[in-house]
Swiss-Prot record:
Catalyzes the 6-electron oxidation of protoporphyrinogen-IX to form protoporphyrin-IX. Binds 1 FAD per subunit. The gene is HEM14. It comes from Saccharomyces cerevisiae (strain ATCC 204508 / S288c). Its cofactor is FAD. Signal peptide: none annotated. This is Protoporphyrinogen oxidase. Present with 5350 molecules/cell in log phase SD medium. NCBIfam families: proto_IX_ox (TIGR00562). InterPro entries: FAD/NAD-bd_sf (IPR036188), Protoporphyrinogen_oxidase (IPR004572), Zeta_carotene_desat/Oxidored (IPR050464). GO terms for cellular component: mitochondrial inner membrane; mitochondrion.
Length: 539
């Protein structure tokens, strides 16, 4: 949350609505920080884990396979990733942690150019030259060279779209239509002309605000690093969230710092069995906590109206069950879902929360056993599709799961090996839709058949996979309905208004987290948000 929280009273009762990774981790951290507090976690589905879903199924021959239907990797440089990995170590599960080495083929990333050819995102001199000679590289040199000379926003501190700030800073719209649009489609499933620069493109936004330009920010940062280099070499310390985490749980600071530095060496991290391994491990740990109760498959339908002199809060479930006298309610579901739970006397708050729409993402998994049909030159993490491509299939991007899985290495369990390393198979996940599905703000989802046929056409055109191999493969179709809040221009101002209105209505009884209220929708960020708020409530 943006606003501060106050300490819970002794033996307080807490309700958590939403059993995704945000709700699970908030519950885990708070239950450890305050064992006296009784926590009840409510999840509408029969499983916890939310949008992190590593689906264990079988192929057409009856052999077990795992298909990722959500996020699958983590960035090693994130503080939230350190919290995840340290939690796994605490629970004796560090053997599941896997890494992708720098320079590994699985770290290669591609963009789709206007002629439907894959172009590697530069990571060397030769790939930089190829990129600059491609239409995707148009405007890049002149845009970067002239960036220092271009004027700041005429309205400093005012939010604007990512497209607007990029076009102003780089002096053309090629960069935003090509590289930037592809990147943000992959993260947010949305359009650069709509996304908030202040929310989703913070570095560029604040570089201009504080330094005047990105070039000047780079110069100033280099000077600062040069001055502090000797000090850093002598004494490196934990900062921010990791410092608070170390203090809160009495961690060995040097070991936590070593873990953080180790993880930063790797561009990507993952978990054996898929990323859902983490929420499953946390759920299993919570099942053993005496102060935690988990209710699944019985959605909360209402936050009960309370008398003016009442300080506790109650919930009503779909079954008709009522859960009363909670001292604190944590909501980790999306803003529109929160709006549906509010009593009628909170109509103005409901309308405010309903202002935020969400994008729907369609996921299509393709699996072909015993054959690798991705060309050797195109092996990598996958590719994203920029606005500059005509893109009739409304494709956001494609992830090459089989390439990633074959190149994972156990990070801490050096004696074990990757069982997929020598296996020949093809596994990819296509991401479709997002903002491109929306008609008048409402997602219109095409049928399974139409969507899979569009993905087949894309894989044939972009990767050269034959129709025979496409027809021989196994296909899975999943709709992640309204899974990603739309972080449009003005989102931060909206969030502050919403949180203030919540506190006006409920005081310190209600807090919010999850994708709609954390720094970003990424898994590490919602976990950091959950820890920070659990810490405030525990002090």
């Amino acid at each position: 949350m943006l606003l501060p929280l106050t300490k819970l009273k002794p033996r307080a009762k807490v309700a958590v609505v939403g059993g995704g990774v945000s709700g699970l981790c908030f519950t885990y951290f708070l239950s450890k920080l305050r064992p006296d507090v009784e926590i009840t976690l409510f999840e509408s589905q029969n499983r916890t884990g939310g949008w992190i879903y590593s689906c264990n199924t079988r192929d057409m021959s009856g052999n077990p396979i795992m298909l990722e239907k959500g996020p699958r990797t983590l960035r090693g440089v994130s503080d939230g990733t350190v919290l995840i990995m340290d939690t796994l170590k605490d629970l004796g599960k560090e053997a599941v942690i896997q890494s992708i080495d720098k320079g590994c083929i699985a770290d290669k990333k591609f963009l789709l150019d206007p002629s439907d050819k894959l172009v590697q995102v530069p990571n060397s001199i030769s790939t930089t030259v190829k990129f600059l000679l491609n239409p995707l590289g148009k405007g890049l040199i002149t845009g970067m060279m002239g960036e220092w000379f271009r004027k700041k926003s005429p309205h400093p501190g005012q939010d604007e779209s990512v497209e607007s700030i990029c076009d102003r800073r780089f002096g053309n719209n090629y960069i935003s239509n090509n590289m930037i649009s592809a990147l943000l489609r992959g993260i947010y499933g949305d359009d650069v002309s709509l996304l908030s620069a202040k929310r989703t493109f913070k570095k560029i936004y604040y570089n201009e605000l504080k330094h005047g330009s990105n070039t000047q920010a780079m110069i100033d940062n280099m000077r600062g690093k040069s001055r502090s280099k000797k000090t850093e070499n002598l004494h490196q310390s934990l900062t921010g969230c990791l410092n608070d985490y170390s203090n809160a749980f009495g961690k060995d600071r040097s070991k936590l710092l070593d873990l953080s530095n180790t993880l930063k060496k790797y561009p990507m991290l993952g978990l054996a069995g898929g990323l859902e391994t983490f929420p499953k491990i946390v759920r299993n740990a919570l099942n053993e906590f005496k102060n935690v109760k988990i209710v699944t498959g019985n959605p909360v339908t209402q936050i009960m109206k309370r008398p003016a002199n009442e300080t506790t809060i109650g919930l009503k479930a779909k079954s008709g069950d009522q859960y009363e006298t909670f001292d604190h309610l944590r909501l980790t579901i999306t803003p529109p879902k929160i709006a549906k739970l509010l009593p009628k006397d909170q109509n103005s708050l409901s309308k405010l929360l309903d202002e935020i729409q969400s994008n729907t993402i369609i996921l299509v998994n393709y699996y072909l056993p015993n054959k690798d049909v991705i060309d050797a030159d195109l092996q990598g993490f996958g590719y994203l599709v920029p606005k500059s491509n005509k893109n009739p299939g409304k494709l956001l991007g494609v992830i090459f799961d089989s390439v990633i899985e074959r190149n994972f290495k156990p990070l801490f369990d050096k004696l074990s090996t990757n069982p997929n390393a020598l296996n020949k198979y093809t596994k990819v996940t296509a991401m479709i839709g997002g903002c491109m599905l929306n008609e008048h703000g409402v997602p219109v989802v095409p049928s399974r058949e139409v969507t899979i046929n569009a993905v087949k056409d894309a894989l044939n055109n972009h990767l050269g996979i034959s129709n025979k191999d496409l027809e021989a493969g196994q296909w899975e179709f999943t709709i992640a309905d309204r899974c990603l809040p739309r972080f449009h221009v003005g989102y931060d101002a909206w969030q502050e208004r919403a949180e203030r209105k919540l506190q006006e209505s409920y005081g310190q009884t209600v807090s919010v987290g999850g994708m709609g209220f954390s720094r970003s929708p990424g898994v590490p960020d919602v976990i950091v948000d959950g820890f920070n708020d659990a810490l405030q409530l525990s002090k």
